[in-house]
Amino acid sequence: MSNKKIIKIIKLQIPGGKANPAPPIGPALGAAGVNIMGFCKEFNAATQDRPGDLLPVVITVYSDKTFSFVMKQSPVSSLIKKALGLESGSKIPNRNKVGKLTRAQITAIAEQKMKDMDVVLLESAERMVEGTARSMGVDVE
């Protein structure tokens, strides 16, 4: 596919297994001339093992209206909410705390997210996870 000309790159966050032609997917792909249902079927098939997880996806549209997509790991904030069973973070993170992450949970999230982060050491990835947790109003052990 390297000989095809790229005409557009679309970045979206879609729940796993729940892609449909409704906004924001339909308008973004329709404007690029991509077969919307074709993308939805491929994405849902690729993410059927991760239902409900919020997944960043980068869709590359080529000049002949074909496409390819790359899925990334869920955002750190989404992984933290899943680990603690939260709906959302704190509205006032410095005052209201909504949960507490253990060292083991931080390490597990950092290991899962490591390939999408621009870090070499696990320790650096853990610090990034801790920072995200603090900004959400989650205490870190």
Swiss-Prot record:
SMART domains: RL11. GO terms for cellular component: cytosolic large ribosomal subunit. CDD domains: Ribosomal_L11. One or more lysine residues are methylated. InterPro entries: Ribosomal_uL11, Ribosomal_uL11_bac-typ, Ribosomal_uL11_C, Ribosomal_uL11_C_sf, Ribosomal_uL11_CS, Ribosomal_uL11_N, Ribosomal_uL11_N_sf. SUPFAM superfamilies: Ribosomal L11/L12e N-terminal domain, Ribosomal protein L11, C-terminal domain. GO terms for molecular function: large ribosomal subunit rRNA binding; structural constituent of ribosome. Keywords: Methylation, Ribonucleoprotein, Ribosomal protein, RNA-binding, rRNA-binding. It comes from the Bacteria. Coiled coil: none annotated. Part of the ribosomal stalk of the 50S ribosomal subunit. Interacts with L10 and the large rRNA to form the base of the stalk. L10 forms an elongated spine to which L12 dimers bind in a sequential fashion forming a multimeric L10(L12)X complex. Belongs to the universal ribosomal protein uL11 family. This is Large ribosomal subunit protein uL11. It comes from Chlamydia trachomatis serovar L2 (strain ATCC VR-902B / DSM 19102 / 434/Bu). The gene is rplK.
